[in-house]
Amino acid sequence: MDLVSASQSYFKRIFQEVSDLKILLLEEDTTKIVSSCITQSNLLEQQIYLTVLLGNKREKLRHLKCVAFLRPTPTTLRLLCEELRDPKYAEYHLYFTNVIPKSFLERLAESDDFEAVKSIQEFFLDYLVVNNDLASFNIPHIIEDSPDNWQDGAFHRTHQGIISLLLSLKKKPVIRYDNNSLLCLKLAEEVSYTIQHESQLFNFRKPDTAPILLLLDRKNDPITPLLTQWTYQAMVHELFGIDNGRVSFSNSTSDNEKSTEIVLNPTLDPFYKETRFDNFGDLGVKIKDYVSHLQTKSTKKASEIESIADMKQFLEAYPEYRRLSGNVSKHVSLVSEISQVVQRENLLEVGEVEQSLVCNEPQSTDFNDIQRLLFSNISENTKLRLAALYSLRFERIDPAKVSALQQMLIAGGVNPLKVSVIPTLLHVAGYSFRQGDVFPPSNLFSRARSGLKGLRGVENVYIQHNPFLKSILLDLIQGRLKETTHPFLNSETRAQTSNEKPQDIIVVIVGGATYEEAHFVSEFNATQPGVRIILAGTTILNSTAYIDDIMYMSTRIK
C-alpha cells in the first residue's frame, strides 16, 4: 500500500495511452492532485506540451490531442459540456478521479456534437498524496451548525475521497468507527452503501485477512494538533505551513523582506526523505554533514581538473552538482529560519511546559508556568495553544483557573473573538465529549509508573508525547480494540473478523490528521512486519489551522 506508487502508475498509464504531443486539461482540484504527484519535468518527458485550466479562455490548437484529468463534479460537468460544444483540440481523452454517475455521461454525450471525445475512464485518485502513506482530502472545515452535523459539501467530498482511496489501493474493507462520533457513523454508513452499490468496482480478490477502514474523530484527541512540533516535516508545517509540498517563509537573517518559496517533496529530495522525521537536534548534525559533503565534492572536482577531458567531465557533472548545491542551500536556509523562530518564540521553554502539562501528573506549578509565558513576548497563537492545553487538562480539576486564563489572554491583548476558541474547544472536545483519555490517569499506580519513567529518563524531553492514535492502532493490531469504543458497522463482518489481527489498515481522521501522527504511522510501517497502514485526513493540521477551525465552529455552532 504505497500512495506514491499508486498515483504514479495511474499517470504513467494515462500518458502512455495517449501518444504524441498533448495538452493536459485540469481544474482547480486536480491541479493540486497532479502537482502532489508529478513534477513539471515529468510532464515534459511525457510529451505534455501545455497544461491548461478548464473554464479559462484558451486559443484553439486543433492539431493537438487533449488529456483531461478532472473531478466528476457539477461545476466540471457544466464547463466540460461548454468545452465540447466548441472543442479547442483534435480529440479529448477524459479521465475522472472518481466514480462517474450515469447522468454525467448522458450530459456529456448530448454535448459532444463534434464527437471529439475518444475515451472516458475512471482513474481513482481523488486525494492529495502527501507521503507514501499519508493522504489529504484538503477540506479545512467540516462542521455545519453543531459538532455532530456535517457540512453537505465537506461530507460529500470526504466520502468521495475515501471511495477513491479504497479503489486506488484495491481494498474492500471492514469498517470500524469512533462510537461517540455521529460524524464518523454517518460517513461509515455512506461508504458502506457505496461499496455495496458499486459491487463490481469493489470485486477484488478476497484476502486472508480483511482490511480495516478505521474512521476516527479529531475531537477524541485535541492535544496533538496543539503541541509544538520537534521533527523536521512537522516543524516546517507548524511554523510556516506546507501547502501541497510548497513552503513560504521570510528570511529573517536577510535584509530582503520578500518571502522565499521552496518545494519539499520526499519523492524528489533524498535528503528531505531521509530527515523529515528526525528531531531538531539530530537535524542540525545531518545538515552539517550535508554541507560538508558538498564542500568535499566541490574541492575534489576543482582539484581534479588538469586536462580538457577533465574539464569536459566536470561540466557534464556540473548540473548534478548545481542541483545538489541548490538543495543544500534550500535546507540550510529553512533550518536557519526554524532556529530563528524557535529562539524568537521561546519554543524550547514553551515545548518543555507543554510536554510536562500533557504527559505528566497535574502539578500546582503548571498554572504559574502558563501564566508566566502568557505575559512574555511570544505570539498570540502560542499563547492560545498554551491556554487551550491547560484548559483541556484542568477543565474538571480547576475550572476557576481555566476561566482566569481566558481573562488573562484578553488582558494581554489577545482578541476576545480568538479567546472564544477555548470554551468552543471544551464544548467540542472537552472531557465529556471524548472517549478514552488522552491524558495519563491520576491514580497511585500511574504516579508510581511516572516515577519509574523519571528514573529511567526519556530520550528527549520535547518528544515525550504520543498521539492517541498510537494506542488505538496498537490495540487494533493486537486484537484488543474494544467494540464498545470502536464498533464494527456490520454485525456480520464483526463475527467473521473480530478475532483476526488485521494486516492492512486505512485510518481516516475526520477533522484532520497531523504530521506527528503521520510520523508514528511511518515508523510503525517500518518496524512492524506484516502490517501496512495508510493515514488520511480531511486536512493536514497544524496548530494555526486547528485553532482557525475551532474559531470557525464558534461562529456556526448554535
Curated annotation (Swiss-Prot):
The record ties this protein, via Gene3D superfamilies, to:
1.25.40.60, 3.40.50.1910, 3.40.50.2060, Syntaxin Binding Protein 1, Chain A, domain 2
One GO molecular-function entry: SNARE binding
The way it spans or sits in the membrane comes to: Peripheral membrane protein
Q: What Pfam families does this protein's entry cite? A: Sec1
Q: Where in the cell is it found?
A: Cytoplasm; Nucleus; Vacuole membrane
Its Gene Ontology biological processes? Golgi vesicle fusion to target membrane; intracellular protein transport; vesicle-mediated transport
Gene Ontology cellular component list: cytosol; endosome; Golgi membrane; nucleus; vacuolar membrane
Q: Which SUPFAM superfamilies match?
A: Sec1/munc18-like (SM) proteins
Q: Which InterPro entries match?
A: Sec-1-like_dom1, Sec-1-like_dom3a, Sec1-like, Sec1-like_dom2, Sec1-like_sf
Q: What happens when the gene is disrupted?
A: displays an accumulation of abnormal vesicular structures and leads to valproic acid sensitivity.
Q: Does the keyword Protein transport apply?
A: yes
Keywords of the record, alphabetical order, are: Cytoplasm, Membrane, Nucleus, Protein transport, Transport, Vacuole
Q: Which family does it belong to?
A: Belongs to the STXBP/unc-18/SEC1 family.
Q: What does this chain do?
A: Vacuolar protein sorting-associated protein involved in Golgi-to-vacuole protein transport.
Q: Which PANTHER family match?
A: VESICLE PROTEIN SORTING-ASSOCIATED
Q: What is this protein called?
A: Vacuolar protein sorting-associated protein 45
The gene name reads: vps45
